[in-house]
UniProtKB/Swiss-Prot annotation:
Database matches in SUPFAM superfamilies: Class II aaRS and biotin synthetases, tRNA-binding arm
Gene3D superfamilies assigned: Bira Bifunctional Protein, Domain 2, Serine-tRNA synthetase, tRNA binding domain
Comment, domains: Consists of two distinct domains, a catalytic core and a N-terminal extension that is involved in tRNA binding.
Catalytic reaction equation(s): tRNA(Ser) + L-serine + ATP = L-seryl-tRNA(Ser) + AMP + diphosphate + H(+); tRNA(Sec) + L-serine + ATP = L-seryl-tRNA(Sec) + AMP + diphosphate + H(+)
UniProt entry keywords in alphabetical sequence: Aminoacyl-tRNA synthetase, ATP-binding, Cytoplasm, Ligase, Nucleotide-binding, Protein biosynthesis
Protein name: Serine--tRNA ligase
Predominant location category: cytoplasm
Organism: Aromatoleum aromaticum (strain DSM 19018 / LMG 30748 / EbN1) (Azoarcus sp. (strain EbN1))
Subunit structure: Homodimer. The tRNA molecule binds across the dimer.
Record-linked NCBIfam families: serS
């Protein structure tokens, strides 16, 4: 959530930054609500001052034995107007807060301008795509040939955009997630957390999914309210610090969690309908950091490097891009995407998105720390995929496929596969 004082004092600069994101910001509507707020507050203050003056006069009149009925009647009228103003102001502040809650984060100064993904800037590549001496297959055909990837049964059970995995492929999927968790906890210093997959509306608001993106979420209604299936572990993990006041010396907090993620994929009709690239349910290992404001931008570079380390250990070619202003997520101030090479598509596809949100989520969550001067200050929050497990599986299948339909297990994964070095096609 943006700082409302920034909107009040630097509205032109905010409008320009939001325009660079392609966000719809009605400055006139905000100014109108602000003018109404100021008028109400000024009138309320005037009435309170008049009531205080009259109360003193009533005391003097009564002490003299004089008639105070007129002054008392005026005080009663003021009380009625104050009550009406209080209700009107509360309603107006709700409108203002809802308006501000619908505005995305402001881009960091280092973010390149642009309207869409075509303006994203590649800043690095790692690895050389493998040259095949046979016609490559995509992950769907490879997985089916291994007898481990079954979309037909998944569709019978649930519908489109679901996958069922069996045997060696299911084990490889599990091994990837465990490998990622072990690297991030043992080598990168993250604390593993196991979190709920259903969260309340306050949690979704805190990380920025609500109210703007409700159509993209799955939810269930129970007697004690509505719960949402998490679209990413960023939601429950980041909300660990909602409404918390932390000591400055506990920062940074570094969390990692492995969860399924659930997305309706509203607006993606017809895109990536084949295979596991775009699913309603998929697994992800998520990195979340709670940082001191002075350390958050360096932390973004480090967090992104931790996600890159997984790709390098798996020896998967990838590229790193910084997203332009028009392609960033709602809560992000700056985002790096990591895109892995998929031989069957002959292109790089997103496998990780790493973002710093600054104080944007912290303000929505009221996540604060007490600084060295003893003052309360908002933390900064960061998140990133480390990595999307299903897409990593896709990349392994396609990059490690062999001419006979088998798939070589990446060397680094063999211990997590119980010594299995090759997945053989079914006979």
């Amino acid at each position: 959530m943006l700082d409302i004082q920034l909107l009040r004092t630097q509205i032109d600069a905010v409008a320009a930054a939001l325009a660079a994101r392609g966000a719809n910001f009605d400055a006139a509507a905000f100014q109108s609500m602000e003018n109404e707020r100021k008028t109400l507050q000024t009138r309320t203050q005037d009435l309170q001052a008049r009531r205080n003056t009259l109360s003193k006069q009533i005391g003097v009149l009564k002490s003299r034995g004089e008639d105070a009925s007129a002054a008392m009647a005026e005080v009663g009228g003021i009380g009625d107007e104050l009550k009406a103003n209080e209700q009107a102001l509360a309603t107006l502040l709700e409108r203002i807060n809802a308006f501000v809650a619908g505005l995305p984060n402001l881009p960091h100064d280092s973010v390149p301008p642009g309207r869409d993904e075509s303006a994203n800037v590649e800043i690095a590549r790692w690895g050389t795509p493998r040259e095949f001496d046979f016609e490559v297959s995509d992950h769907v055909d490879i997985g089916s040939g291994l007898g481990g990837l079954d979309f037909e049964t998944a569709a019978k059970i649930s519908g489109s955009r679901f996958a069922l995995m069996r045997d060696g492929l299911a084990r490889l999927h599990r091994a990837l997630a465990q490998f990622m968790l072990d690297v991030h906890t043992r080598e990168h210093g993250y604390t593993e957390v196991h979190v709920p997959y259903l969260v309340n509306p306050d949690s979704m608001f805190g990380t920025g999914q609500l109210p703007k993106f409700e159509a993209e979420l799955f939810s269930v209604m129970k007697d004690d309210g509505r719960f949402y299936l998490i679209p990413t572990a960023e939601v429950p993990i980041t909300n660990i610090v909602r409404n918390e006041l932390l000591a400055h010396d506990v920062l940074p907090l570094k969390f990692v969690g492995h969860t399924p993620c659930f997305r309706s994929e509203a607006g993606s009709y017809g895109r990536d309908t084949r295979g596991m690239i775009r699913q309603h349910q998929f697994d992800k290992v998520e990195l979340v950091r709670i940082e001191h404001p002075d350390a958050s931008w360096a932390a973004l570079e480090e967090l992104t490097g931790h996600a890159e380390a997984i790709l390098r250990k798996l020896e998967l070619p990838y590229r790193k891009v910084v997203l332009c202003t028009g392609d960033m997520g709602f809560s992000a101030a700056k985002t790096y995407d990591l895109e892995v090479w998929l031989p069957a598509q002959k292109t790089y596809r997103e496998i990780s998105s790493c973002s710093c949100t600054g104080a944007f989520q912290a303000r929505r969550m009221q996540a604060r720390f007490r600084n060295t001067q003893g003052k309360n200050e908002l933390v900064h929050t960061l998140n990133g995929s480390g990595l999307a497990v299903g897409r990593t599986l896709v990349a392994v299948l396609e990059n490690y496929q062999q001419a006979d339909g088998s798939v070589v297990v990446p060397k680094v994964l063999v211990p997590w596969m119980g010594g299995i070095e090759v997945l053989e096609p079914r006979g």
